């Protein structure tokens, strides 16, 4: 039986980031063979990682990347905010979103899934890739990405179409793009425009509002008018273009787009947005 020295255990820990006890056990099982010990650690870690999948993973962070061909956001969850700051966790997320964007694919490969399991095994938490968003950037489209706070618990991507793309260098446009991303982070719209809202959802809301007013004693025609007003207000809360703009609540985002178009002498249109949030 080979003797496992503290130096051997230390070396294996430095190479794998696994715990002292796990490294010692792996070296013992492997008879002191470092490569075999690494394999044993991976096997041990993946098995224990599978057991953690039922544990809550309510922390984490959002990662982003853009290469001017594709842009994307990635939400990776973990169990504690401490791990969300762990350099192995952060490096994994940054590396993964870069790989996904450069490939233009919004799903994990087998090797990426294995990397995820190995990370969970090393850190000993339930770590999951919750959401992946990848979008292709056309020649006349501008993408702005915003990550909120040190832990990046909110991630926003907005895509704008600009007829004269040279105008995207204008300071007015750049400030607006940033403000728009901040707006999405602050107000968390669900849809881009009213037309995107599912008709069944609107019908359900109408029924709810009508039910709430049944005991009011008001005539049916009045109730219909009130319900229509409530629906309009609700849509303005969940549709980005209808929301009051974060920097000027007297106008909507749609109206602000028109003002920016005039200010830079080029039509600016909202193409899409994505909002991701931890928790």
Swiss-Prot record:
Query: Where is this gene product found?
Result: Cytoplasm
* Keywords for the protein's UniProt record, in alphabetical order: Cytoplasm, Elongation factor, Protein biosynthesis
Q: Which domain of life is it from?
A: Bacteria
GO MF assignments: translation elongation factor activity
Keyword set includes Protein biosynthesis: yes
Q: What is its main location?
A: cytoplasm
PANTHER family of this UniProt entry? ELONGATION FACTOR TS, ELONGATION FACTOR TS, MITOCHONDRIAL
Please state which protein family the record places this protein in.
Belongs to the EF-Ts family.
Q: What is this protein called?
A: Elongation factor Ts
Organism taxonomic ancestry: Bacteria, Pseudomonadati, Spirochaetota, Spirochaetia, Spirochaetales
Q: Encoded by which gene?
A: tsf
């Amino acid at each position: 039986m080979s003797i496992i020295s503290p130096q051997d255990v230390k070396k294996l820990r430095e190479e794998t980031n696994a715990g002292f006890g796990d490294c010692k056990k792996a070296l013992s099982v492997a008879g002191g063979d470092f490569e075999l010990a690494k394999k044993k650690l991976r096997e041990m870690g993946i098995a224990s990682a599978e057991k953690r999948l039922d544990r809550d993973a309510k922390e984490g962070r959002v990662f982003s990347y853009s290469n001017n061909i594709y842009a994307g956001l990635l939400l990776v969850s973990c169990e504690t905010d401490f791990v969300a700051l762990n350099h192995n966790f952060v490096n994994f997320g940054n590396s993964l979103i870069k790989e996904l964007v450069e490939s233009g694919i919004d799903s994990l490969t087998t090797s990426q899934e294995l990397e995820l399991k190995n990370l969970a095994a090393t850190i000993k938490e339930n770590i999951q890739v919750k959401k992946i968003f990848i979008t292709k950037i056309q020649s006349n489209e501008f993408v702005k990405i915003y990550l909120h706070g040190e832990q990046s618990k909110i991630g926003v991507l907005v895509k704008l179409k600009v007829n004269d793309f040279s105008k995207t260098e204008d300071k007015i446009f750049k400030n607006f793009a940033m403000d728009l991303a901040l707006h999405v982070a602050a107000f968390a719209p669900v849809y881009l425009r009213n037309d995107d809202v599912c008709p069944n959802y609107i019908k359900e809301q109408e029924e709810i509002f009508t039910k709430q007013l049944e005991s009011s004693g008001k005539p049916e025609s009045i109730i219909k008018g009130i319900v229509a007003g409530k629906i309009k207000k609700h849509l303005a809360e969940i549709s980005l273009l209808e929301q009051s703009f974060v920097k000027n609540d007297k106008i909507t985002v749609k109206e602000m787009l028109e003002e920016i178009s005039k200010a830079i002498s080029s039509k600016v249109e909202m193409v899409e947005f994505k909002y991701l949030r931890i928790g």
